[in-house]
């Protein structure tokens, strides 16, 4: 019989807790997402994360370590090469990424790809560079509305993003163009992790706003993950936020899209009221998209404080046979240069009301510790070719 009937894993997207040993290879020197956020604000109040021992793992200004944190804490290292969303989440579920996804941050996309995309979609392409979503809209939104040209851009991540004004370009047309882009970028030399449809509203510079009709077209995971094992063995696998997109639906029994990170937590609280057996996997993207990439430590701190209030409600709702894991998929230090993710350790905070003990675990060498622990709990073997060692027997 399973030790825990339900396991909830909440990914605070981009909440790194200090540079990994190899971070300089990734151009990241002395990065520290959580530490630097706390240093950037006058007050920082996260009592529930504090109670779970986050400040025992890592020094945080304004947040003292606690003598008896609830549950268990660890600093997790990433085994895979990369510091992006897909690599982080796929590794959590057991995959070891040894070849990084293609990025076009410095060069833009090859002309040959753009020519094919124009031929197949019927739209001229503008942009073709790395930019933030707000910048590219201010620069080219009015042009798109006037001409019907397609705004294509990238970021430090392995993504090809296409913007479309919902009323003039049209949502269905945007999705059609993205499906064509996904098909074209399955070639090895153009293989990006995700195509992202970026719809927006507004008619002039300074007024453009992205809508919640974003859609991701991810690569399928290259191998079976813990999610497949759970689904194939009739366990519920409920996703919240962009998890379903990240895994291209593989191993998911129910997907819930979120309008924001606060909405994602509200959805999680609703799911906690339901009777199910299995895994609820939650991604809260606003930390990364709104505050990390935009280098806004104050906004990030406020978002964490809002999250912490809802975390308190989650802790109250946990059953004796529930396990909660709080983690992140990479760093994104909002005080660092540029707009890229940062290569950092991430927190592993695990708590169940049935735990008698508490304390710090040794640093796991891979995010796949999470997937291995989940598989172990439900009596499943890790899929062939995956990595990760369970810490289930240490959660007592």
From Swiss-Prot:
Record: residues binding Mn(2+) 2: 288, 293, 341
Record keyword Metal-binding present: yes
Pfam families: Metalloenzyme
EC category name: isomerase
Cofactor comment text: Binds 2 manganese ions.
EC number: 5.4.2.7
Family statement drawn from the similarity comment of this UniProt entry: Belongs to the phosphopentomutase family.
Purpose of the protein: Isomerase that catalyzes the conversion of deoxy-ribose 1-phosphate (dRib-1-P) and ribose 1-phosphate (Rib-1-P) to deoxy-ribose 5-phosphate (dRib-5-P) and ribose 5-phosphate (Rib-5-P), respectively.
Protein name: Phosphopentomutase
